[in-house]
UniProtKB/Swiss-Prot annotation:
Belongs to the adenylate kinase family. CDD domains: ADK. It is an enzyme of class 2 (transferase). Residues 30-59 are annotated as: NMP. Residues 126-163 are annotated as: LID. It comes from the Bacteria. It comes from Syntrophobacter fumaroxidans (strain DSM 10017 / MPOB). Gene3D superfamilies: P-loop containing nucleotide triphosphate hydrolases (3.40.50.300). GO terms for biological process: AMP salvage. This is Adenylate kinase.
């Protein structure tokens, strides 16, 4: 089973991904991990990517597709794989389809975890971090015993800049703008599986596995 996992920041994608790879015994493939591995191993594609990264430029799609192609031909992908964080746009999705066609493979399903923006804002802006020890809390899901104080060391809890409402709203808008055309692309192919991402992690996992089989 070859699947793609989509979902906005705060949708619980990471939790579901780790459970899915356990259930289906398939590896999770992220472009970040692939790039780091290629750089460490000094592969031709890794060296090619390094040229762009050293200049602070984005690694071209052709290089990323090459890395994906190498990765999915490894033995641990024989039963399938889950792509996480790729493709990010329609041009990448088209290039991926073309490459998979050459390998006589295809994407079987695209799981899109959907959560209303109001819920996502609550999840993402509710995070609090201890200034002293770095421990993490959440005002809704994991509140400290004393408001504003760390349970572990008594340090002051604060909201990081990237967790404030303006920054979170901006991140969600970027995701929406980038991903909407991608969702439409896979919907037209009949591969999109929309999942209600509100509820317990167990309930959401159950919805995903019910659709994937």
């Amino acid at each position: 089973m070859n699947i793609i996992l989509l979902g906005p920041p705060g949708a619980g994608k990471g939790t579901q991904a780790s459970r899915l790879i356990g259930k289906y015994a398939i590896p999770q493939i992220s472009t970040g991990d692939m790039l780091r591995a290629a750089l460490k191993e000094g592969t031709p594609l890794g060296l090619e990517a390094k040229k762009y990264m050293d200049q602070g430029a984005l690694v071209p799609d052709s290089v990323v597709i090459g890395l994906v192609k190498e990765r999915i031909q490894k033995p641990d992908c024989s039963k399938g794989y889950m792509l996480d964080g790729f493709p990010r746009n329609v041009s990448q999705a088209e290039a991926l389809d073309m490459m998979l066609g050459e390998l006589k493979q295809r994407i079987d399903g695209v799981v899109c975890i959907e959560v209303p923006n109001k819920e996502l804002l609550g999840r993402l802006t509710g995070r609090r971090t201890c200034r002293s020890c770095g421990a993490g809390f959440h005002v809704m899901f994991d509140p400290p015993k004393t408001d504003g104080k760390c349970d572990k060391c008594g340090g002051e809890l604060y909201q990081r800049d990237d967790d404030n409402e303006a920054t979170v709203s901006s991140r969600l808008k970027v995701y929406e703008d980038q991903t909407k055309p991608l969702i439409d692309y896979y919907e037209k192919q009949g591969k999109l599986r929309r999942i209600d991402g509100v509820g317990s992690m167990d309930a959401i996992f159950g919805r995903i596995t019910a659709i994937l089989g």
